[in-house]
């Protein structure tokens, strides 16, 4: 059965690195990264005369949901041609909604004969902070300048409804706070995705 793999977590947990490394080890896979849409989003900020801030009300109201809509549409198209499609994106709000995830599962099964697999990248908040500093990305400027306010709103807990999956590979937890955890998780998760 085809699979749509969502690699999710709060920002700077290592989604991109994990996603890229998994994609290298899997066959017949399409890799999609929501960050690819950032240049288009920057133009929207510019045209609207708004300061570029991915934590702003403007972003939340006009851009955020459209980015997810577009990346999912690309994934649906890719499922017509590939066995595995992997999306690297936080899905911060969506992943907490049981009805959203159930609806996505149903759509994938009915329209694409595909299964949803969620990989939760689990990383300590301290590690995320250090990674955010190291990557030095403009998308993190506000977060780093307002770290205490930002981190107080980030939920690092796996949503309860995801822990109730019917199948072993509905939810895979990728531990990623150290190189040792990364290697162990890679060894455990890659074979499950091949099935």
Predicted regions, residues:
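The Walker A (P-loop) glycine that initiates the GxxxxGKT/S ATP-binding motif of P-loop NTPases
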Residues: 9
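ATP-binding Walker
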Residues: 13
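Walker A/P-loop
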Residues: 16
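Conserved substrate/cofactor phosphate-moiety recognition/catalytic segment
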Residues: 20-70
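Glycine-rich phosphate-binding loop used to anchor ATP phosphates in small-molecule kinases
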Residues: 62-112
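Conserved phosphate-donor/acceptor-positioning beta-strand/loop module used by diverse small-molecule
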Residues: 111-132
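Small-molecule kinase domains that catalyze NTP-dependent phosphoryl transfer to phosphate-bearing small molecules
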Residues: 122, 133-185
């Amino acid at each position: 059965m085809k699979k749509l793999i969502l690699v999710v977590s709060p920002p700077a947990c290592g989604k991109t690195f994990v996603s890229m490394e998994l994609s290298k080890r899997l066959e017949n896979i399409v890799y999609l990264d929501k960050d690819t849409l950032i240049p288009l989003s920057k133009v929207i900020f510019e045209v609207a005369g708004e300061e570029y801030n991915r934590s702003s009300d403007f972003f939340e109201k006009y851009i955020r949901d459209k980015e997810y809509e577009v990346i999912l549409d690309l994934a649906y198209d890719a499922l017509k041609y590939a066995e595995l499609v992997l999306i690297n994106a936080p899905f911060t709000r969506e992943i907490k909604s049981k009805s959203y995830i159930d609806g996505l599962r149903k759509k994938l099964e009915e329209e694409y004969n595909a299964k949803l697999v969620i990989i939760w990248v689990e990383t300590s908040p301290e590690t995320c902070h250090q990674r955010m500093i190291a990557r030095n990305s403009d998308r993190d400027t506000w977060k780093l300048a307002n770290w205490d306010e930002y981190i107080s709103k980030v939920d690092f807990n796996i949503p309860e409804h995801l822990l109730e999956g019917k199948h072993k590979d509905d939810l895979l937890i990728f531990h990623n706070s150290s190189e040792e955890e990364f290697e162990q998780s890679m060894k455990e998760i890659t074979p499950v995705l091949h099935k």
